[in-house]
A protein has these predicted regions:
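An active-site-proximal structural segment forming one wall of the substrate-binding cleft
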Residues: 2-19, 23, 27-119, 136-149
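Extracellular glycoside hydrolase catalytic/binding regions
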Residues: 88, 95-116, 120-226
Length: 226
């Protein structure tokens, strides 16, 4: 393990300018951290800090290295389980999720290097698009996205896709988790500031999973369609 400053230095030296910083809803409510190596004086500034305070420190250090930050709600609980929806795991509700984003937007709106919110990592499974139901990701993204923009109007709002279950049907049978944006054509995400919206589908190569289109003889045209 390494010191966080050393890692930020390497990221900068490699020419990257933006970090997607994951967090869990549980961490933002916790008073203690775990998994940080303090051996040999590493990460001394993080000792005794809450997860929120650790985030503060890393964001400020990133700013000193001209690194931008996009916050990413990667999971609900600290177990890292990739639950399909943005709520409903480990007792967290949709209100908890929106309130967490509102709190983060309020806290970091004045930080010039915090530039965006990736609202939910890879919605999949029971997540739908454009149905208007409780599990409609488009509806939830509008709810949280507009809550963020009310506090941080200049942030980018990253909205990933889903996996399946698009209202009115979809052209392709299979998609990656977070990769299905077919529903956008008929049901786009509506934000209070339309120019802050970034559709952010997740796509992978065959090393992650041998999706059928990778072995299809018409792969070139399939990729063009995607």
């Amino acid at each position: 393990t390494r010191d966080y400053k050393d890692m930020l230095n390497q990221i900068s030296s490699l020419g990257f300018n933006t970090i997607r910083m994951p967090f869990s809803l549980q961490a933002m409510r916790s008073t203690t951290t775990s998994g940080i190596d303090y051996g040999g004086g590493k990460n001394a500034e993080l000792a005794g800090k809450t997860p929120q305070q650790v985030m503060d420190i890393i964001i400020d250090e990133a700013a000193r290295k001209n690194l931008m930050i996009i916050l990413d709600n990667h999971s609900q609980a600290d177990d890292g389980f990739m639950f399909d929806l943005w709520c409903g795991h480990a007792g967290f509700t949709e209100t908890d999720w929106v309130n967490t984003w509102t709190s983060l937007a309020t806290r970091y709106a004045s930080k010039p290097n915090v530039i965006g919110a990736d609202l939910k990592n890879e919605p999949h499974g029971s997540a739908t698009w454009g149905t208007g139901a409780a599990n409609d990701w488009r509806r939830a993204a509008e709810l949280a996205g507009n809550a963020v923009l009310a506090k941080a109007p200049n942030w980018l709002i990253l909205v990933e896709g889903i996996e399946g279950q698009v209202a009115g049907g979809q052209q392709l049978d299979r998609h990656w988790w977070g990769g299905n944006l077919e529903g956008v054509r008929d049901n786009p995400v509506r934000l209070s500031r339309a120019n802050r919206l970034v559709y952010s589908p997740h796509e992978y190569g065959p090393g992650v999973d041998a999706q059928p289109w990778f072995s299809d003889p018409n792969m070139a045209s399939i990729l063009a369609d995607r």
